[in-house]
Amino acid sequence: MSKFEAFLRPTQTYHSRTYDRISKHHNFNGTGKTILVTGGSSGVGYSICQAFAEADVARIAIVSRSPGPQAAAKAALEAAHPAVQIVTYAASITDHARMAAILAELGPVDVLVLCAAVVHRQVPATAITAAEMQAAFDVNVLAPFHLVQAYLATTTAGTKTVIHVSSAAAQSRSPFRAGYGPSKAAATQVMQHFAAERASPALRVFSFHPGAFYTPSVAEHYAPDSTGWEDINLPAHFARWLAGPESGFLNGRYLWAHWDVDELIALRDRVERDSSFLTIGLVV
């Protein structure tokens, strides 16, 4: 069992693996859509690219720093989904001018997935360097902030959807993660502001905790037996469901991929009555 299953949640059901409701009956229509995924060449980001490719979107743009994994991701996606155009950009999301240029080159983007992140060394707060703390906030907060600003300035005929891959560390004290947890909390609150201040319902912004997966980046910080690892298809299919028509009432909310979507839909009245429900903040 994952350590995260013990956290309080608004749904009775906790999924640790994907399920038919989001894997097969997600109601997302990918026809003609362009998806931009930062950090999309590996791990959760790559699994999200796979999920959207399965929905027959027109284009998937992957932004990541490492050319090798990026080329491998492109080749694998093209082999499995030859009708989907895969475009790649080797760039750091902290290069704000470059990211704005990528958006301009792509043209209309229907779904922006913010998955790129940095995790510092697992050390006490007294041992984290100023450079590590700065990097956590540069990559995890400022880069998504600038990218969403640039995205909102672009023109899209339909709905714009921002999906921010957050972390349970945003809502809890994660030992030896004094930079990572606060940076993810800050980014999630920034997304809540974009959602609350939106000029039109044609913009939807979501943040969600993806789960625990033994990816190469996670292996740099955790042992294989440190927790119960989960199905990486779960956050991918949940992200795709968020991009569909059923999730609009959850605009601005912080969610978990593990929460059953039909049970979330059953909470719609409460969500619409209480603007603070399912957000990062103080509950008394």
From Swiss-Prot:
Any Pfam family: adh_short
Single GO molecular function: oxidoreductase activity, acting on NAD(P)H, oxygen as acceptor
Active site location: S166 (proton donor), Y180 (proton donor), K184 (lowers pka of active site tyr)
InterPro entries (alphabetical): NAD(P)-bd_dom_sf, SDR_fam
E.C. designation(s): 1.1.1.-
Statement: the UniProt record of this protein carries the keyword NADP: yes
Annotated residues for binding of NADP(+): V37, Y180, K184, T215
Keyword NADP among record annotations: yes
PANTHER family in the record: BENZIL REDUCTASE (PTHR43008), CHAIN DEHYDROGENASE, PUTATIVE (AFU_ORTHOLOGUE AFUA_4G08710)-RELATED (PTHR43008:SF4)
Protein name, as recorded: Short chain dehydrogenase/reductase AacuD
Organism: Aspergillus aculeatus (strain ATCC 16872 / CBS 172.66 / WB 5094)
UniProt lineage: Eukaryota, Fungi, Dikarya, Ascomycota, Pezizomycotina
